[in-house]
From Swiss-Prot:
Post-translational modification: Phosphorylated.
Assembly, per entry: Interacts with CCND1 and GRAP2. May also interact with COPS5, RPLP0, SIRT6, SYF2 and TCF3.
Principal location: cytoplasm
Region entry Interaction with TCF3, spans: 1-183, 149-358
The protein's name in its UniProt record: Cyclin-D1-binding protein 1
A GO CC term attached to the entry: cytoplasm
Pfam families in UniProt: GCIP_C, GCIP_N
Top-level taxonomic group: Eukaryota
Role played: May negatively regulate cell cycle progression. May act at least in part via inhibition of the cyclin-D1/CDK4 complex, thereby preventing phosphorylation of RB1 and blocking E2F-dependent transcription.
Ranges where the record places region Required for interaction with CCND1: 1-207
Region (Interaction with RPLP0): 1-189, 238-358
Compartment(s) of residence: Cytoplasm; Nucleus
UniProt keyword annotation of rRNA processing present: no
Amino acid sequence: MESAAVSAAPDATLDPPLEQLRHLAGELRQLLPGVRVGEAQETTKEFDREAFWRRFNEAAVTVSREATTLTVAFSRLPLPSPQETQRFCEQVHAAIKAIIGVYYLFPKDQGITLRKLVRSATLDIVDDMAQLVEALYINPAQSSPENLISYNSVWDACQHVPQIPKDNKAAALSVLTKSVDLVKDAHEEMEQAVEECDPYCGLLNDIEEDSSDNHVDEDILGCPNNRDSYWSEEDQELIIPCLALARASKACLKKIRLSVAENGKKDQVAQLDDIVDISDEISPSVDDLALSIYPPVCPLTVRINSAKLASVLKKALEITKASHVTPQPEDSWIPLLINAVDHCMNRIKELTQNEVES
């Protein structure tokens, strides 16, 4: 009898199942800041690449298994008992701590670019698991769309782990390819808007149809019924070198990626990181320029954003030129692209000089 009383004692101290889930979600959320800023674990042992990836993959499999177990348990009645819930929560927490622990084993000297990809994958898994626990807490005992979406997110994040590049060169190529695609999309959007010669054409046509049907004054509605919604001839003239600069950005990234693919060396991690770091600034700079060409156009803003992009492009080309991926620095493609960037920028300066002087 005495032993039975002792074994039953913990039951009274355990929180209800859903309350335990709420606490678990909070605990998982608290782990995220540490992963974002945490440093690699210092060790005197030589890094074992194969062992790391094996452990990282195994840790991801464990997380996905625990996500499945937890989802099944809390998607039907009766809900698990407090004791069962405690066990589920402990297993989920342990699985998440384990994969974070493996991430901390990845040293910086293997490449900052690759380490960022490993960190991003780890953050996705932790964040998605926290969202799953929250969804199960909010929608228990049912297969709600939110629960299924959250579960699939954890599963997808774990399935992504084996697809992470295994060395810094592969990681650099992965990031550069993404940057090329982003700049390509931005350039195509700019070209499409210019071809239509009216960036807000679709929106204004819809408004005009509604207004004519209802006999409503556009000015009363505050519709953009003025030149601020269109490009002036001066705007269109300024946009031409801006488009050329965006096109040069795409060409720069493609050539840099090709140079890394053909000449990049896996052991030159620092130089690869430098190339990726500066190349990462190109896409956001193109986006800023693209946004500034929409009416009402402010020539000074266009000039500033163009100068920022031109500076980033030239710096990226110079860093690439000085690195091992360009065995012949005198290679004509680098000075050719630098000249193209300078030509675009000089034309933009000419067209905006009056704004600077006024």
